[in-house]
């Protein structure tokens, strides 16, 4: 393994209940096995003091209705704070960043679930992020019904998790469309056993790291 390899940005994506926490552990174990141990973990929305405040507004605001576009703009405000103040500096230091969600979430949830115009989303993405994107994305795919059942088992649902099943069906459909067109993304069947999901993730990460370190 080339220990002088630059920092990389790996993102975990998926619906509620997809198992991103378990997936992160699998990614860490595989990276460590390959000698990559200088890791940083992020989540979206969140990850900086301002971004965490926006996260609370996005997920738990109850004083007034949050419009779809206000939600979208708060997500991008939180995202750019995290990218500029945390992720880019970490990558410059050679750290490998493992993110719980990134821009693909907005493309899927707001573009698919909320049905916001895709051209608006693309324009906003380019304006805010420029050409910044993950080096590798693992999309944990499962049916919304299974995911929501898992999420309910964790306790009270937040504002996003309370959306109806049709919302999550649209979100999943958009996720799959986006991932299939993305050569830097891999689909993981998250309906399998934890052992099988873990094995698939480790294989995907190992294959990707080997491909970029040749």
From Swiss-Prot:
Q: Which GO terms describe its molecular function?
A: ATP binding; dTMP kinase activity
Q: Which residues form a coiled coil?
A: none
Keyword Transmembrane helix tagged? no
Swiss-Prot/TrEMBL GO biological process terms: dTDP biosynthetic process; dTTP biosynthetic process; dUDP biosynthetic process
| The keyword Nucleotide-binding belongs to this UniProt entry's keyword annotation | yes
PROSITE patterns to which the protein is assigned, alphabetical:
THYMIDYLATE_KINASE
Q: What class of enzyme is it?
A: transferase
One GO CC term, this protein: cytosol
User: Which of UniProt's keywords are assigned here?
Assistant: ATP-binding, Kinase, Nucleotide biosynthesis, Nucleotide-binding, Transferase
**What EC number(s) does its UniProt record assign?**
2.7.4.9
Question: What does it catalyze?
Answer: dTMP + ATP = dTDP + ADP
Supply the PANTHER family for this chain: THYMIDYLATE KINASE, UMP-CMP KINASE 2, MITOCHONDRIAL
Role, per record: Phosphorylation of dTMP to form dTDP in both de novo and salvage pathways of dTTP synthesis.
Family (UniProt): Belongs to the thymidylate kinase family.
Name the UniProt record assigns to this protein: Thymidylate kinase
Which species does this protein come from? Mannheimia succiniciproducens (strain KCTC 0769BP / MBEL55E)
| Lineage, opening ranks | Bacteria, Pseudomonadati, Pseudomonadota, Gammaproteobacteria, Pasteurellales
What is the gene name? tmk
């Amino acid at each position: 393994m080339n220990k002088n390899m630059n920092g990389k940005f790996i993102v975990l994506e998926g619906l509620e209940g997809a198992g991103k926490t378990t997936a992160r552990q699998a990614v860490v174990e595989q990276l460590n096995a390959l000698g990559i141990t200088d890791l940083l973990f992020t989540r979206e929305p969140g990850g900086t003091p301002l971004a965490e405040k926006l996260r609370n507004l996005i997920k738990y605001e109850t004083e007034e209705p949050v419009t779809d576009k206000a939600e979208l703009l708060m997500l991008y405000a939180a995202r750019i704070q995290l990218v500029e103040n945390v992720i880019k500096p970490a990558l410059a230091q050679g750290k490998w960043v493992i993110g719980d969600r990134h821009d693909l979430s907005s493309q899927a949830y707001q573009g698919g679930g909320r049905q916001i115009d895709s051209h608006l989303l693309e324009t906003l993405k380019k304006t805010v992020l420029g050409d910044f994107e993950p080096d590798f994305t693992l999309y944990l795919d499962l049916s919304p019904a299974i995911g929501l059942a898992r999420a309910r088992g964790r306790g009270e649902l937040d504002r996003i998790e309370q959306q109806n099943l049709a919302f999550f069906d649209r979100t999943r459909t958009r996720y799959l469309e986006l991932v299939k067109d993305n050569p830097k993304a891999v689909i993981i069947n998250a309906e399998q056993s934890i052992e099988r999901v873990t094995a698939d993730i480790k294989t995907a990460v190992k294959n990707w790291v080997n491909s970029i370190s040749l």
